Amino acid sequence: NGDFSTNKGLAFSLRTRRLGNTKIDANYTLSYAGGTGSNADTGYRIAWLGGNDPTFTSPLNFDQRHTASLVIDYRTGNKGLLKLFGANMLFRYGSGMKYTPSKPRTAIFGGQLSDQPIAALNSGVMPSTFNADLRVDKTFMVNNVAVGVFCIVNNVFNNQMVTDVYNYSGLPDNDGYLTTQAGQNWVNDYSIGTQAFGEQLYNSRIAYPTNYASARHVQLGVRVDF
């Protein structure tokens, strides 16, 4: 197996002591991932399809140029009017992952076994992502028993974050099949009343939830320490 990959970049980290009630942790990474194969079976698939072995490096599937995170933690301690209260906010940013622009093909019907690229390997860039998570907690002392209540909110702003795309469009909800003659024939065959019905029917079939990260999620809980 002659495949290889390299990953190079820079990482920056800033951590503060607790200043008053607040502590900050910030991180940033600049990364370049390139090589001749993104996973262990890349060479096998090329040989199976009768292709030529790569002679130059390309961006890898997991090549992500920028990632950053910021944690802001606030704690009141055991003094003051709002004692034993805490809040933690986590912000995360990631630039888009790579994909290879390809000819349109159906994502739900059989036929074509693999994509047919129309541009350089992994030359397309998926949308970037931004997420924020929040945790708030408060502890009450009841007869030397610590009762803590907490609320965790994942994806606070309910951002729609794309995790995978179709190689034709670079979008999570368009595989390009309806732009082909075969796709138009399918729409005409399954349309009831209007062509729009057939298009909506097909698009509903390719709207995979796995192409998106989770929406806002709220958890409430109680913790007892004794």
Describe each PLM feature range.
Residues 1-98:
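Gram-negative outer-membrane beta-barrel transporters
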Residues 1-5, 33-46, 52-63, 100-107, ...:
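Extracellular/periplasm-exposed beta-strand and loop segments of Gram-negative cell-envelope proteins
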Residues 8-12, 56, 66-72, 130-136, ...:
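Hydrophobic, lipid-facing positions within transmembrane beta-strands of outer-membrane proteins
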Residues 9, 117-120, 196, 220:
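Intrinsic disorder/low-complexity segments enriched in polar/small residues
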Residues 10, 24, 46, 70-72, ...:
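Weak global preference for isoleucine
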Residues 51-52, 68-71, 115, 132-134, ...:
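Short amphipathic alpha-helical surface micro-motifs
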Residues 79-113, 127-131, 138-226:
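C-terminal beta-signal and adjacent terminal beta-strands/loops
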